[in-house]
């Protein structure tokens, strides 16, 4: 698990692959532990506290902020209707991450803040994941779409030759966002 996480962290060209494989490995470990009745620690939610800058261009940070904002809004709607595993805490964490990312970007805040949830409300339990074509819990698809958007933004940032306003992370804190690690 940590090898894939390290690949994502230290090899920009393999960020997407490392991130997804790390998540898959963590999921496999959880499934195996559950089947073997092994108690493993629950993942901790991470935050953006203490992060002063990121080595990602302005446009990518703004795109990541928009993805976090959109899933935060959807989770808020789902929590209000008691759908899936959505909670107001999850919604708040996404929205806080969104705000932090847009602040770090220095870009004009063009987030919509409210989004069309008609399709989500029509399919509150399961929905087709457009990336895989498979039915999955709607809240899980929302999280995966957010993660895919962020991975694409970072991948675009790492391959962009004219990336604007890049700076190094100045925090010693390893927190990166509001989703489970």
Regions found by a protein language model. Name each.
Residues 1-181:
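All-alpha RGS (Regulator of G-protein Signaling) helical domain and cognate RGS-like helical scaffolds
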